């Protein structure tokens, strides 16, 4: 059994990797920090392939898929993401667009590519990590909240498509509340 976890270097992704390893899954751990991924690898008792990639770069998403597509991934945890804090009109536009590329575009690309493989095999499990932020307006974190709403709605729609087809492929979305991680970038204080 093999699972791919994005954002595996810390927080929810790291905990998901630990949990999946404890369940006997070999892992493909993806994040920007090779050092943190290597530390995770040393901690786990199953095989761990470390792939340091910046998934906010569109090509990195395709590179990731092409590197692992022949490994018969059973589980994809789309977890990589971060938030920005500040008034919408004050936050740095390029940093915000980078966040949106990671929180939305990477999730979209990886969901589509791996879901196609899961459908061909009629098995697989995909979890997209959203947030309870998906259900609220989110002043001072407007773009982050909107990005998590996208992840929630996309996953909900894909779930419904698969349910109607009576597919054996499973899709779910995790919407945790606030979590003590380093994924919040303080850009500008109100």
Feature annotation, model-predicted:
Residues 131:
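Residue(s) in the substrate-gating loop at a strand-loop-helix junction
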Residues 52-63, 93:
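The beta1-alpha1 cofactor-binding region of Rossmann-like NAD(H)/NADP(H)-dependent oxidoreductases
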Residues 9-10:
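Conserved glycine-rich cofactor-binding loop
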Residues 23-39:
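Conserved glycine-rich Rossmann-like NAD(P)H-binding loop of the short-chain dehydrogenase/reductase
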Residues 111, 147:
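Active-site helix of classical SDR
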Residues 185-190:
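Residue-level detector of conserved catalytic or cofactor/ligand-binding positions
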Residues 87-89, 95-100:
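Substrate-binding pocket helix/loop in short-chain dehydrogenase/reductase
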């Amino acid at each position: 059994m093999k699972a791919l976890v994005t954002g595996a270097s810390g927080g929810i992704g790291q905990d998901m990797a630990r949990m999946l390893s404890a369940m006997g899954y070999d892992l493909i751990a993806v994040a920007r920090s090779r050092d943190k991924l290597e530390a995770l690898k040393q901690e786990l008792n199953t095989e761990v392939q470390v792939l340091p990639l910046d998934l906010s770069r569109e090509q990195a998403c395709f590179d990731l898929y092409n590197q692992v597509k022949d490994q018969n991934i059973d589980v994809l945890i789309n977890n990589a993401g971060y938030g920005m804090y500040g008034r919408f009109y004050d936050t740095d536009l390029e940093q915000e667009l980078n966040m949106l590329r990671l929180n939305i575009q990477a999730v979209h690309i990886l969901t589509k590519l791996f879901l196609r493989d899961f459908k061909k095999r009629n098995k697989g499990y995909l979890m997209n990590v959203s947030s309870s932020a998906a259900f609220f307006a989110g002043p001072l974190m407007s773009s982050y909240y909107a990005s998590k709403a996208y992840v929630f709605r996309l996953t909900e729609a894909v779930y419904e498509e698969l349910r109607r087809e009576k597919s054996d492929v499973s899709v779910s979305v995790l919407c945790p509340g606030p979590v003590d991680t380093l994924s919040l970038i303080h850009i500008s204080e109100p």
